[in-house]
Regions:
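Flexible, glycine-rich terminal cap/loop adjacent to redox cofactors
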Residues: 251-253, 265-277, 289, 293-300, ...
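Glycine-rich dinucleotide-binding loop and its adjacent helix/turn
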Residues: 288, 380-435, 439, 464-468, ...
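A Rossmann-like FAD-binding core segment of flavoenzymes
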Residues: 314-315, 350-353, 357-365, 371, ...
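N-terminal Rossmann-like FAD-binding beta1-loop-alpha1 element of flavoenzymes
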Residues: 246-273, 422-431
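Glycine-rich flavin
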Residues: 263-269, 274-409, 442-446, 452-453, ...
């Protein structure tokens, strides 16, 4: 039977570990460590002179291989060998030999560490290592170069630890080769005077170590200097004002813009908020608020439809679509004051309804006036993607911007896209009575979520009458004699009255001056930002959908705090935006909510994790409400109770998720959730019960066996 890759790798690891143990056993068993002393290498230098004179090439080869073996196995004595190399072969040849031998030996140790340990460490500490690996990807070469320049950091430890990161082998070798050169040269030069050296402390004097430490810091100083030079050069195109009219100008009054302006005003800075359309942005006017109002109306219809389950005979006579849409507008109007000019003006924000254009990093034209500002926050949001599908302009299509203007319900609605918006709209219109067809090119709806959670949602969409076509896409649209149809890639066609496009959103990055400033844009068409929400022009910040990485209202508000604080106080202290705990909810029935990683993501990251599940159909409150569909699934790290991620699919899953978001934010494990009193009967008890399942799965079996013996004894007493 063939050995699979996993078994073969395990076998190889055992062989390598056996070799390492053998080498260390021989080294210490035969007391070879006694030769790793200054006196011994002095003796060796004196006794090997004649041999080297006669067999110089062979002696150099033996020395080279010995150095590689000792450094590769992280055995003690590398410093002494470096001195010996200088004493035996002189500065030039000694430096040449040791420079390459030390780099090759270090790389061998690096590779052994990576092969033996990285998988285990990644599984055990994957979530923590993500941030380190991202830092290594950005500046790993600089980190390693600095560490190599400073001999204070143990040579062998650097090799082992860097093997656990994602730095490439090529980079590790090349940076080590260059970075260790200065320190190696010092010790090789000292080795040429080996007979005069009485202790290693004389070589590694405080002044020398300080000099090398300064040399190690030099790359960072140089990098900072280059960054400042580049920044100065970037700003050189414009003239900076001597004083400013505003501390901050915010462009866009969606969630990100409103929070940025609010924080700026709260700390008594002078801030102007510019919005050319409506306060509240997409979320209030065309996104979160109207869609949830629509979902509520659709849910009311569904509740009446199943009223006989509760012993109530009721029927729906008519669905007044115009009233449904009217209620949505009334909901928007009721919430509008929360985001109004009056409210924000009372907070100290100057609110202007106008078009803004960034003239330079410190000047913004707002209609006819030009204001100077210390900082700018771009919060211009995003708009629905309208793809260039042949024939699309010949048919009546809707987006999340235009859907809310409907006064007549489409009898046949075609929904393109299987993401959260597509699923929410498809289910809502199906419940309201439309014949709905949903097309998704992927093999699964809600592609970022686990298949078991999506299956629950998809089953409900199908039960509500949504015709779901997966693994397909529209090739073209046809308009003929007032009839509209979509021709699919597989040749089928779908007849419709309206088509709703839910194919994602693209950032609003044009039309307000960014192009002229050459602000960096990512491949995804987002404004490129750093960890502090700064764009490529440091005093211009970006938040929300225009910069990503998440297009969620609450993330835009979250980013806004960091942008505002960094803009106003960044000269004193800057804060990196924290994305570790980001909750998200899809408001279908049942809702699908998640925070942290999914099970699929844990598998892809090869983490050491556990999955614990609790089915909602076992929950008393769910049974009383006849809301038994779904489950709570928790991903924990290894055998610990540390929560890595939670997926909930259930009625009101978004409300249930808040407990886990808080727990993850403040590093509270499942034991804390289990130890918290949850009121009975509530849906929130599901969180306690899944924690109980985890506890049972991780109970100390050996201890419980002794406890059972104790109780048997007590019954006899």
């Amino acid at each position: 039977m063939a050995i699979n890759d996993k078994e073969q790798k395990s076998h190889s690891k055992k062989i390598i570990i056996a070799v390492i143990i053998t080498v260390f056993t021989l080294w210490y068993g035969f007391d070879l460590n006694q030769y790793a002393s200054l006196e011994q290498i002095k003796t060796l230098q004196q006794t090997s002179g004649d041999y080297i004179a006669e067999h110089r090439s062979l002696a150099m080869l033996i020395f080279f291989v010995s150095y590689v073996v000792i450094t590769g196995f992280s055995l003690p004595g590398a410093v002494l060998l470096t001195l010996l190399g200088g004493g035996l072969f002189g500065f030039g040849y000694g430096l040449l030999l040791i420079s390459f031998a030390s780099s090759i030996g270090a790389t061998l140790a690096f590779l052994v560490s990576r092969y033996l340990l990285r998988d285990y460490v990644q599984k055990k500490f994957g979530a923590r290592l993500d941030a380190i690996n991202k830092g290594v990807e950005k500046e790993g070469d600089f980190y390693l170069f600095s560490l190599r320049l400073i001999p204070v950091f143990p040579f062998f430890l650097i090799n082992i630890l860097m093997g656990l990161t994602k730095i490439s082998t090529r980079s590790f070798y090349l940076v080590s080769q260059v970075g260790m050169l200065a320190g190696t040269a010092v010790y090789v030069w000292a080795g040429t005077k080996l007979s005069e050296i009485n202790s290693l402390s004389g070589i590694a004097s405080p002044s020398l170590l300080s000099a090398l430490a300064l040399l190690g810091i030099f790359p960072w100083v140089a990098k900072r200097g280059l960054a400042l030079f580049s920044q100065r050069k970037r700003y050189s195109r414009w003239t900076k004002p001597k004083s400013f009219d505003r501390n901050m100008i915010v462009i866009g009054a969606g969630a990100g813009g409103l929070v940025s302006a609010y924080i700026a005003a709260a700390v008594k800075s002078k801030v102007t908020l510019v919005e050319k359309h409506r306060m509240g942005g997409d979320c209030l006017n065309t996104g979160c608020v109207p869609s949830k109002a629509l979902i509520r109306s659709a849910h009311a219809v569904a509740e009446i439809g199943r009223s006989n389950e509760f012993g109530v005979d009721a029927e729906i006579k008519t669905i007044n679509f115009e009233k449904v849409m009217g209620r949505i507008q009334q909901v928007i109007k009721t919430i509008e004051p929360h985001d109004s000019i009056a409210r924000y003006s009372a907070m100290g924000v100057e609110c202007l309804t106008a078009e803004a254009k960034i003239i330079d990093p410190w000047r913004v034209q707002i209609d006819e006036q030009v204001l100077t500002t210390k900082n700018i926050v771009v919060a211009t949001g995003a708009r629905p993607i309208v793809p260039p599908i042949p024939g699309l302009t010949d048919v009546p299509y809707l987006t999340s911007d235009t859907l809310w203007q409907l006064t007549e319900q489409p009898a046949r609605l075609l929904v393109l896209g299987g993401g959260p918006i597509g699923c929410e709209i498809a289910q809502s219109f199906a419940r309201l009575g439309s014949t709905v067809t949903q097309v998704e090119m992927a093999s699964q709806l809600l592609g970022r979520e686990d298949a078991d959670a999506v299956a629950v949602v998809q089953a409900e969409l199908l039960a509500d009458g949504v015709n779901i076509l997966l693994g397909n896409k529209v090739a073209s649209f046809v308009s003929e004699d007032g009839q509209y149809s979509a021709v699919l890639a597989n040749g089928d066609s779908v007849v419709f009255d309206q088509v709703f496009l839910a194919l994602g959103r693209q950032a609003n990055i044009r039309g307000f001056g960014l192009e002229a400033l050459d602000v960096a844009i990512t491949e995804r068409g987002l404004i490129e930002i750093n960890d502090y929400q700064q764009t490529s022009i440091p005093n211009i910040y970006a938040v929300g959908d225009v910069s990503g990485p998440y297009q969620l209202t609450h993330v835009a508000a979250h980013q806004a705090w960091f942008a505002a604080v960094n803009a106003l106080f960044g000269s004193v202290k800057k804060f990196a935006t924290d994305y570790r705990v980001i909750p998200a909810v899809t408001y279908t029935y049942p809702e699908l909510a998640r925070v942290g990683i999914s099970e699929n993501e844990a598998q892809q990251a090869q983490l050491d994790y556990q999955v614990t599940k609790y089915d909602i159909d076992d929950l008393d409150r769910a049974i009383t409400d006849s809301e038994t569909k779904g489950f709570v699934k928790v991903i924990t790290a290894g055998n610990s109770d540390k929560i890595l991620g939670v997926t909930i699919v259930a009625s009101h899953a978004g409300e249930l998720l808040a407990e886990y978001t808080l727990a993850m934010k403040y590093k509270l494990g499942l034991n804390k959730v289990l130890g918290t009193i949850h009121p009975y009967p509530t849906m929130s008890e599901a969180n306690k019960y899944v924690a109980g399942n985890w506890k049972r799965n991780n109970s100390p079996e050996k201890l419980l066996a002794w406890v059972a013996k104790f109780h048997r004894y007590m019954r006899k007493a």
